[in-house]
Amino acid sequence: IVLNYEEGAENCVLNGDKNSEIFLSEIIGAKPVKGRHMSMESLYEYGSRAGFWRLHKLFQKKKIPITVFGVGMALEKNPEICKAIKDAGYEVASHGWRWIDYQNIKKSEEKKHMKLAIQTHKKIFGERPNGWYTGRCSSNTRDLVMEDGGFLYDSDSYSDDLPYWEIRGKKKQLIIPYTLDNNDMRFATNQGFNTGDHFFT
């Protein structure tokens, strides 16, 4: 089970962005706002204020080991959540520095963000992350992961049901594909699930 922790690193003018977030919220078809979008900010805040804690308590009660895909900026802003993650012994893979779309970000900027994410992870958890998942990656992301060379696995792929090796010259990278079919985000998208029964069938 993977718990994505992104709240606090999304597009928001408070983070220096030009527009509000539009991705993965309960506001279907949200349009970017050039300024503060109080409803969107509040929806994202739910994850750090209530969502994480509800799931964390459930996982602890049922003794379920999980992996947290943690966005560096979001983790840095929420030390109480980081403490809970450490105390629980969850694996934490890096989910990048920001929860933004890297499609049109320069490779040099994306590389800088990757370094920031790794440094922040080391500062918080005392070691570098073993896994990487940007989520909204670019055509450069896999190159940067392999150039870094320190990740046991990369999950920026949806291309298989099983892990596989990507080989480029003398370098190889374990790919553990991500899945959107087994993701609760499908409850928040218009092509997604309508009921819990749809999810389980």
Give the predicted meaning of each segment.
Residues 1-176, 180-181, 199-201:
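Catalytic alpha-helical scaffold of carbohydrate-active enzymes acting on polysaccharides/glycoconjugates
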Residues 183-201:
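Aromatic-anchored helix/helix-loop segment that forms the rim or "lid"
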